[in-house]
Amino acid sequence: MLNQHSLEEIAEIHNLLGNIKQEYEIGIKPLLIKNSPKLFKNPHTVPKLKKIQINRGLGLAAQNTNLLKKNIEEFEKIAGQKPLITRSKKAIAGFKIREDMELGLSVTLRGEKMYTFLTKLLFFTFAQIRDFRGLSLRSFDKAGNYTLGLKEQLIFPEIDYDDVDQIQGFTINIILEHGSPKYRAESIDKILNGMILFKFLRFPLNDCGYYDKYEAFSDINRNWDKKRHLKRKRWSQE
């Protein structure tokens, strides 16, 4: 049952959700254009969030109907959307895998659901990770997309400790859209602009000061320091 404190936090989250979407439109585009004026002569080519993919591999355990059903329910609680069941494309005898065998779950979030999940991830979930030291810069791919792994589902506020039979994690892929199909850039430019975008959206990137020479990062840090951050105790301490 939600108490008054929880309701206040939920109201604050909805405000933060609106702020993230609005700040992207009025803030991140000028910063990226300022950082790469030649690259972004057309403002429609500025990278933006396209979708978030959440994946979980279950292996042969997916053949257990009850376990699969429980995992689907967890996905629905966390992502707010029913996941797709991923299946094997071919048989692999050495791993006892048959063709079209159920092996895991995957869900793709766009639009409002994407921003809702992103807000929860930034302001609730990361705060629940024990000894969290930030996100590695090495997890960017050549297109500026970011991939991260979470070791357990208990860090999400929708999951009750008593309902969990087995600790399982996720892989989260945050995909960017670079505007026009004619958009061309060096991989390093895409990665740097991806870093700037994620930093602006308050991702706790563990940059260790190496990127302070980029003026856009200083602008973002000053903007970030003015914002109010929600703080939650770890479930184990409540």
Curated annotation (Swiss-Prot):
Compartment(s) where it occurs, according to its Swiss-Prot or TrEMBL record: Plastid, Chloroplast
Example GO biological process: translation
Assembly and interaction partners: Part of the 50S ribosomal subunit; contacts the 5S rRNA.
NCBIfam families registered for this protein in UniProt: PRK00010.1
GO molecular function: rRNA binding; structural constituent of ribosome
Superkingdom assignment: Eukaryota
Organism: Phaeodactylum tricornutum (strain CCAP 1055/1)
HAMAP family membership: Ribosomal_uL5_B
GO cellular component: chloroplast; ribonucleoprotein complex; ribosome
Pfam families found in the cross-reference section: Ribosomal_L5, Ribosomal_L5_C
Protein's recorded name: Large ribosomal subunit protein uL5c
Record key words, sorted: Chloroplast, Plastid, Ribonucleoprotein, Ribosomal protein, RNA-binding, rRNA-binding
Family: Belongs to the universal ribosomal protein uL5 family.
Chief location category: plastid
Function in brief: Binds 5S rRNA, forms part of the central protuberance of the 50S subunit.
